[in-house]
Amino acid sequence: MSTARFIKCVTVGDGAVGKTCMLISYTSNTFPTDYVPTVFDNFSANVVVDGNTVNLGLWDTAGQEDYNRLRPLSYRGADVFLLAFSLISKASYENIHKKWIPELRHYAPNVPIVLVGTKLDLREDKQFFLDHPGLAPISTAQGEELKRMIGAAAYIECSSKTQQNVKSVFDSAIKVVLCPPKPKKKNTRKQRSCWIL
């Protein structure tokens, strides 16, 4: 019997977008009701995806600016990033390309990214938007466009509260590592060299 392959999966994104809730929902099938800012927490789960057993190491990171110098320490050895934003926070959506992509490309330039839109249950919650005037939800089309813009391997929307698509997020991360997408071929037209003798 072969040992399960270890995959290090690191969650990244602004504070309070639901990274920790997503991990807890996935590993324990529960939804925490209190917000507790994260420093670093690690979870581990043995998972079977498409007949492959993997030991999925889940690393949670803090999105707050106070941890900007500490957070990148968790990036070493990462196999995949779950880059999360809240579907009800335009600021967290915009920070994906303003803050998080530059940080990830600096510290881990070749690690694949799965883009995750969290709090899917609130996007259609009319009462939530009545209680929070001025907020506008992020659409699936906007998420797909951001995926293309940053070159993410996948984009998934989920709700940790209802558990909708939570398993799909982690299955997708595992599949990206086990079967990485083929890099797009650049248009390589033969260029002729000009030599001056």
Swiss-Prot record:
Motif Effector region: where in chain: 35-43
Membrane topology: Peripheral membrane protein
Top-rank lineage group of the source organism: Eukaryota
Main location class: cytoplasm
Keywords: Cytoplasm, GTP-binding, Lipoprotein, Membrane, Methylation, Nucleotide-binding, Prenylation
Ligand binding (GTP): 13-20, 60-64, 118-121
Residue ranges annotated as propeptide in the record: 195-197
Cellular component, GO, one term: plasma membrane
Modification Cysteine methyl ester occurs at: 194
Places the protein is found: Cytoplasm; Membrane
GO biological process: actin filament organization; cortical cytoskeleton organization; establishment or maintenance of cell polarity; regulation of actin cytoskeleton organization; regulation of cell shape; signal transduction; small GTPase-mediated signal transduction
GO molecular function, one term: GTPase activity
S-geranylgeranyl cysteine lipid modification positions: 194
TM helices/strands, residue ranges: none
Record's function text: Inactive GDP-bound Rho GTPases reside in the cytosol, are found in a complex with Rho GDP-dissociation inhibitors (Rho GDIs), and are released from the GDI protein in order to translocate to membranes upon activation.
Family: Belongs to the small GTPase superfamily. Rho family.
The protein's name in its UniProt record: Rac-like GTP-binding protein 7
Organism field: Oryza sativa subsp. japonica (Rice)
